[in-house]
Amino acid sequence: VSEMTVSRVLRNRGDVSAATREKVLTAARTLGYVPNKIAGGLASQRVNLVAVVIPSLSNMVFPDVLGGISAELDDTGLQPVVGVTNYSPSREDAVLYDMLSWRPSGVILAGLEHSRAARAMLDNAGLPVVEIMDVDGTPIDTAVGISHRRAGAEMADEILAAGYRRIGFIGTHMPEDHRARKRLAGFEERLGERGVQLAAREYYQGGSSLLKGREMTERILTREPELDFLYFSNDMIGAGGLLWCMENGYDIPGRLGLAGFNGVELLDGLPMRLTTTDARRIDIGRRAARIVAGKEARPENGIIALAPTILPGETIRKH
């Protein structure tokens, strides 16, 4: 096998037969050889890494997105490398600065709201940049996601069509969670168009958990016992709320309806299926990775809008 062929196999480039490829890779494994990607990157000005910047690893949403990205990059020679911002703009700036210094082949990052410094770095990077999870705004390069305003409005339609009118909202008091804020804005706007106002709202600090959902649900229903529907900003607190209501004898969905957001697998294990919205997380990850890998062309307007889908579940009255 020639040096050129070995080089092509190790760089995952060019047309090499499967048998020859396997022979080269077996020899490399036997020798414990790991190619120096930085040296290779100096020649091409790019390494085979895709920077993936997300706000949280504890949030159940992002592992699904990462799964979609990883599955789509699997046959490309590109590897996702993850940075976490904890919903902090300054942390996002630092993560992007470090990751872009490696000259990755592309960047996938959550959200459309970034600091001026982050936007400047991404504008000047000269590589594919895909902002994910949201399409309500103007992308730097390409956006792949759902409209959270639309998701909120469509859930409002569903709740009103089922006959509920005394509606409360429970969500995070996190100013940097722009997508949750847009969902609530779309939700309230649609309620207002139908002559209904939110009857109560309860905000919490920090991350979402079943316990937080239980506590917030108890608090809002103690304060406003006449509520007939609770809209939660995500499934985790919605699931906690559902468990609290069931333990306390609420007639669901007759006396009280509940809905969350995301469509996470956790809901499969609950005694009742929580009404929610599928946020298309795996599809978003896949489509973003396809654009970075060059499998799919960037759309002319830079936006790939997927449709949020309501999953009716069992916690809303049939209508």
Regions found by a protein language model. Give the residues of each.
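Short acidic capping loops at alpha-helix termini that bridge into adjacent secondary structure
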Residues: 166, 198-201, 252-257
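N-terminal helix-turn-helix/winged-helix DNA-binding helices
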Residues: 29-67, 75-78, 86-87, 98-101
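Flexible loop/hinge segments that line or gate small-molecule binding clefts
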Residues: 87, 110-154, 196, 236, ...
